[in-house]
């Protein structure tokens, strides 16, 4: 699925509204339902799964936004931002095909609604990402009601069968030739209602509040990584399971290092004299300074590898390397005497017939040959 266009699967454009998406989904679902394709069941099942998954994501505004921005994996795992719904696709399936195929999905009576998954973006420095850190976050969400402990009831409450759906949790609406099942608007699919519900949560078993969580970020995480905290999302209705919380990692740009996988890269300026004569330099790493020996006649762009000075993988014990690329700085703010010394130095280089600038000589030799061949 990750390499397929969900809009193309449903046959709609990227600007399609929800009515167009729903209409396309219903048409394709009826066409490719396995029960309607007994002679081609394997292909129909595969198509039907794709259609279902495409509709699950594109019918949810937050998942759709996540898909448009980050792609299939982000939308499918619920890592878009702010908060989002995991959804229950079996409900959609039952709504569309409940009557057509003999009520494929049976209603479970008093149905509980799992809490939505939530997402939270944490911004880290490179040092925090590499060494790990403990972060405290605040999330405004639905939490279990402390008054009724999630039951939605108080001492005077009692449950009774929903008079609208007679306990089925669904009502049916006629649309043309089809009877479409939808969650009961009175009991919201639970099949029963609470008389004299909890005053604090109004019978839902949950209330809006701000939670404070301490999150342990493991060492070695990288930009775009996601951490799943099971059961730390939105509280479910009437004691139903809570959703999950997804922590999405964003690592700020570092003034010295650039990270690629488990390797680190940096650009290290050296003086003209050090490039010519060589010397020892102190190189910064995320674990302190180390000595790097620069050989004589080092050219700009030369890269030195410091093994094991990169990042330890969050998924294994392997450690990356640090790559230092040198750039030779041209002296500035020269005095008259210094300029004269450089001119004398240049004249000395031209004596004796030796080549001191092989790259320049090769470049200009190629230019001469180019014009000679015109």
Curated annotation (Swiss-Prot):
Gene3D superfamilies: DnaJ domain, Heat shock protein DnaJ, cysteine-rich domain, Urease metallochaperone UreE, N-terminal domain. Residues 5-71 form the J domain. Binds 2 Zn(2+) ions per monomer. Pfam families: DnaJ, DnaJ_C, DnaJ_CXXCXGXG. GO terms for molecular function: ATP binding; heat shock protein binding; unfolded protein binding; zinc ion binding. PROSITE patterns: DNAJ_1, DNAJ_2, ZF_CR. Disulfide bonds: none annotated. CXXCXGXG motif repeats lie at residues 145-152, 162-169, 184-191, 198-205. One of its GO terms (cellular component) is cytoplasm. The keyword Cytoplasm applies. It comes from the Bacteria. GO terms for biological process: chaperone cofactor-dependent protein refolding; DNA replication; protein refolding; response to heat. It is found in: Cytoplasm. Its cofactor is Zn(2+). A zinc finger (CR-type) spans 132-210. Zn(2+) 2 binds at residues 162, 165, 184, 187. Keywords: Chaperone, Cytoplasm, DNA replication, Metal-binding, Repeat, Stress response, Zinc, Zinc-finger. Zn(2+) 1 binds at residues 145, 148, 198, 201. Participates actively in the response to hyperosmotic and heat shock by preventing the aggregation of stress-denatured proteins and by disaggregating proteins, also in an autonomous, DnaK-independent fashion. Unfolded proteins bind initially to DnaJ; upon interaction with the DnaJ-bound protein, DnaK hydrolyzes its bound ATP, resulting in the formation of a stable complex. GrpE releases ADP from DnaK; ATP binding to DnaK triggers the release of the substrate protein, thus completing the reaction cycle. Belongs to the DnaJ family. The J domain is necessary and sufficient to stimulate DnaK ATPase activity. Zinc center 1 plays an important role in the autonomous, DnaK-independent chaperone activity of DnaJ. Zinc center 2 is essential for interaction with DnaK and for DnaJ activity. HAMAP family: DnaJ. Homodimer. This is Chaperone protein DnaJ. It comes from Dichelobacter nodosus (strain VCS1703A). The lineage of its organism: Bacteria, Pseudomonadati, Pseudomonadota, Gammaproteobacteria, Cardiobacteriales. The gene is dnaJ.
């Amino acid at each position: 699925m990750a390499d397929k266009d969900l809009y193309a699967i449903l046959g709609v454009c990227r600007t399609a509204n929800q009515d167009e998406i729903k209409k396309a989904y219903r048409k394709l679902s009826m066409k490719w339902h396995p029960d309607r394709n007994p002679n081609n069941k394997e292909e129909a099942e595969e198509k039907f799964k794709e259609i279902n998954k495409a509709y699950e994501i594109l019918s949810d505004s937050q998942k759709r936004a996540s898909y448009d921005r980050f792609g299939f994996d982000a939308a499918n795992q619920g890592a878009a931002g702010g908060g989002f719904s995991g959804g229950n696709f079996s409900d959609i399936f039952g709504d569309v095909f409940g009557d057509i195929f003999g009520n494929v999905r049976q209603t479970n009576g008093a149905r509980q609604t799992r809490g939505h998954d939530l997402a939270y973006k944490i911004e880290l420095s490179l040092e925090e990402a590499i060494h790990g850190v403990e972060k405290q976050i605040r999330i405004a969400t639905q939490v279990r009601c402390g008054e009724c402990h999630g039951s939605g009831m108080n001492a005077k409450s009692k449950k009774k069968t929903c008079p609208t759906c007679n306990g089925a949790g669904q009502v049916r609406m006629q649309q043309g030739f089809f009877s479409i099942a939808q969650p009961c608007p009175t009991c919201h699919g639970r099949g029963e209602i609470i008389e004299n519900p909890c005053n604090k949560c109004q019978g839902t078993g949950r209330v809006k509040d701000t939670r404070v969580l301490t999150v342990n970020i493991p060492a070695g995480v990288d930009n775009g990584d996601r951490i799943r905290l099971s059961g730390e999302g939105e509280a479910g209705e009437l004691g139903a399971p809570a959703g999950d919380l997804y922590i999405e990692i964003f690592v700020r740009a570092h003034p010295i290092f650039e990270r690629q996988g488990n390797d680190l890269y940096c650009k290290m300026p050296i003086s003209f004299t050090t490039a010519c004569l060589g010397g020892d330099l102190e190189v910064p790493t995320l674990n302190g300074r180390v000595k790097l020996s620069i050989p004589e006649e080092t050219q700009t762009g030369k890269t030195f590898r410091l093994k094991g000075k990169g990042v330890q993988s969050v998924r294994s014990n392997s450690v990356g390397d640090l790559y230092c690329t040198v750039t030779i700085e041209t002296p500035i703010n020269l005095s008259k005497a210094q300029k004269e010394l450089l001119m004398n130095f240049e004249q000395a280089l031209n004596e004796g017939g030796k080549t001191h600038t092989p790259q320049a000589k090769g470049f200009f030799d190629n230019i001469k040959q180019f014009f000679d061949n015109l």
